[in-house]
């Protein structure tokens, strides 16, 4: 198959899935809630979308946050600072609430970065008083940090890191070096559910997603970004390096591919999503109607994909750790392993492209 001639095959427009922005709420100045529904879907499509979105939202949506504070003022019993009204715990929580902005792509793979708060009382220390690295700004300059009640200096060295909802910043920080800050994650909560329904004598499924985000990220923006991350990654999978090929008995073909320069989280959920998509390969070529029983179970006599084996290998490059994902795909004639990989990746791109409509919906609002 010539890759230059390979294209997405969109299903029947009459039955093609569409999404609805069901609900949106804002809570104070910190959080936003959104609820979405996508239908009609097959059982396999809804499971694939559910898995992929959950992983992408929690691992691929990034934000800049303060993760560590080294306070030069003397602390009393690790609870209070002389001359400051707020407790140490309250001050650290206030740092964790500060929203930092910048062009995130410029900070990926770099850092941690250092910021300095150096003020003298009496005054109310705010986010605007922090000296930040170039390219990083605070979203709300008046965000409160601490009330300094006496004429004393208040000096804090802050660590800034690019974090996801599953990362906790750098580890190995002792109490002598400062205090860890628990930052507000970009995605605070993701729930999803699948409901079946009948229409026109056929069984379909509806995927419902609800999400709580930390501002300035809003739910439909997170859904758009997460889907784009998945699509960009599977564009790379489409171009995976073909390492080996062999033919076995009974029309079995085995192909080995390699996808490089991945993070650990990316390797894991590429494997999970791709496995589901590979076992969907070939269904659209089947002659005759599919019954529910055939559609809901994997029949080795029907599907052209017989097996998927994955292996992950870590390596160092320019001081950073990356992973290579090796994919061994077993197919049955006439489907070739590379054709199966391309068709599965194309199916993933087709499904997640549905959420690119979220940007248009946002413009309407």
UniProtKB/Swiss-Prot annotation:
UniProt keywords, alphabetically: Chloroplast, DNA-directed RNA polymerase, Nucleotidyltransferase, Plastid, Transcription, Transferase
One of the GO biological process terms: DNA-templated transcription
Presence of the UniProt keyword Chloroplast in the record: yes
Family annotation (SUPFAM superfamilies): Insert subdomain of RNA polymerase alpha subunit, RBP11-like subunits of RNA polymerase
Transmembrane segments: none
EC code: 2.7.7.6
Organism of provenance: Pelargonium hortorum
A GO cellular-component term linked to this record: DNA-directed RNA polymerase complex
GO molecular function, one term: DNA-directed RNA polymerase activity
Function: DNA-dependent RNA polymerase catalyzes the transcription of DNA into RNA using the four ribonucleoside triphosphates as substrates.
Record keyword Cell inner membrane present: no
Enzyme class, UniProt record, top EC level: transferase
Reactions performed catalytically: RNA(n) + a ribonucleoside 5'-triphosphate = RNA(n+1) + diphosphate
Protein name: Putative DNA-directed RNA polymerase subunit alpha-like 3
Complex formation: In plastids the minimal PEP RNA polymerase catalytic core is composed of four subunits: alpha, beta, beta', and beta''. When a (nuclear-encoded) sigma factor is associated with the core the holoenzyme is formed, which can initiate transcription.
Family to which the UniProt record says this protein belongs: Belongs to the RNA polymerase alpha chain family.
Gene name as annotated: rpoAL3-A
Localization (cell): Plastid, Chloroplast
InterPro entries: RBP11-like (IPR036603), RNApol_insert_sf (IPR036643)
């Amino acid at each position: 198959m010539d890759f230059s001639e390979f294209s997405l095959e969109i299903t029947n427009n009459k039955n093609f899935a569409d999404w609805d922005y069901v609900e949106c709420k804002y809570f104070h100045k910190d959080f936003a809630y959104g609820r979405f529904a996508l239908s009609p879907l097959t059982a396999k499509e809804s499971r694939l979308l559910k898995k992929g979105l959950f992983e992408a939202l929690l691992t691929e949506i990034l934000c800049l946050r303060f993760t560590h504070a080294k306070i030069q003022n003397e602390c009393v019993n690790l609870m209070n600072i002389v001359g400051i009204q707020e407790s140490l715990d309250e001050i650290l929580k206030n740092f964790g609430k500060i929203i930092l902005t910048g062009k995130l792509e410029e900070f990926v793979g770099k850092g941690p970065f250092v910021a300095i708060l150096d003020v003298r009382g009496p005054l109310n220390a705010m986010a605007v008083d922090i000296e930040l690295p170039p390219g990083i700004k605070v979203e709300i300059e008046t965000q409160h940090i601490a009330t300094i009640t006496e004429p004393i200096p208040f000096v804090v060295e802050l660590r800034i890191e690019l974090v996801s909802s599953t990362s906790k910043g750098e580890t190995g920080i002792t109490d002598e070096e400062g205090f860890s800050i628990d930052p507000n994650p970009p995605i605070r909560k993701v729930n999803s559910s699948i409901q079946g329904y009948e229409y026109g004598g056929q069984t379909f499924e509806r995927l419902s997603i609800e999400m709580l985000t930390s501002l300035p990220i809003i739910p439909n923006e997170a859904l758009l970004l997460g889907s784009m991350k998945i699509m960009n990654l599977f564009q790379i999978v489409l171009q995976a390096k073909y390492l080996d090929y062999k033919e076995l008995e009974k029309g079995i073909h085995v192909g080995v591919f390699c996808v490089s320069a991945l993070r650990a989280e990316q390797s894991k959920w590429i494997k999970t999503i791709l496995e589901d998509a590979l076992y969907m390969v070939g269904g659209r070529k089947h002659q005759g109607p599919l019954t529910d029983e055939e559609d809901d179970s994997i029949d080795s006599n029907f599907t052209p994909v017989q097996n998927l084996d994955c292996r992950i290998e870590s390596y160092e490059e320019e001081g950073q750790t990356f992973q290579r994902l090796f994919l061994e795909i077993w197919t049955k004639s006439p489907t070739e392993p590379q054709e199966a990989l391309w068709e599965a990746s194309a199916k993933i791109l087709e499904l997640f492209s549905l959420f690119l409509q979220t940007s248009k919906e946002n413009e309407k609002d």
